């Protein structure tokens, strides 16, 4: 870390207060961790075309403290059920007219289920035994349970985004944030 006078500031603060330097370190670590979460959430939301709020609430931050200067980010990497994207509605498609006696490729006379901003052909809404409503779709090749919940795969984009962003942000922002936090702690100690 190449910050001018950092060692001197740390030494002075350590002489004045025992908790000032660890408090500054914890503050800087927490800021870096929360910015890593928000940047990763934005990147995943852009890639998967899911609202940023839905992605961000899958990450939990256990904040660093004076006694334990480690922040822990826990991410739920499970697939996102489509029903969470927003209101589900059936849109009638009048473009594909069929002749009398022919079966439609899309069941229900050419209607398509739209959830949020996604069109899901051949899907329907059903209440499961656990009481939750989900968007279901028939799955070819599954003999025993031929219907399945429609989900958006999130494991790969979340993993790659968090691994990239955490390392990059730690390199770029931690020294700056540590400097700001030390200055803040110094101001707090001087005010007392």
Segments predicted by a language model, with ranges:
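Short, Lys/Arg-rich flexible segments
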Residues: 1-192
């Amino acid at each position: 870390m190449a910050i001018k006078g950092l060692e001197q500031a740390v030494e002075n603060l350590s002489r004045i207060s025992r908790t000032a330097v660890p408090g500054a370190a914890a503050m800087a670590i927490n800021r870096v961790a929360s910015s890593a979460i928000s940047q990763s959430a934005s990147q995943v939301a852009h890639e998967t075309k899911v609202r940023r709020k839905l992605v961000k609430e899958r990450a939990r931050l256990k904040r660093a403290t004076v006694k334990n200067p480690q922040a822990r980010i826990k991410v739920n990497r499970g697939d996102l059920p489509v029903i969470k994207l927003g209101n589900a509605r059936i849109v009638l498609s009048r473009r594909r007219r069929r002749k009398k006696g022919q079966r439609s490729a899309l069941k229900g006379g050419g209607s398509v289920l739209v959830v949020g901003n996604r069109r899901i052909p051949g899907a329907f809404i059903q209440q499961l035994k656990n009481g939750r409503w989900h968007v279901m779709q028939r799955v070819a090749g599954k003999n025993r349970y031929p219907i399945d919940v429609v989900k958006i795969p999130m494991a790969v984009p979340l993993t790659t985004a968090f691994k990239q962003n955490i390392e990059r942000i730690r390199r770029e922002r931690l020294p700056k944030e540590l400097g700001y936090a030390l200055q803040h702690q110094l101001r707090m100690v001087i005010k007392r």
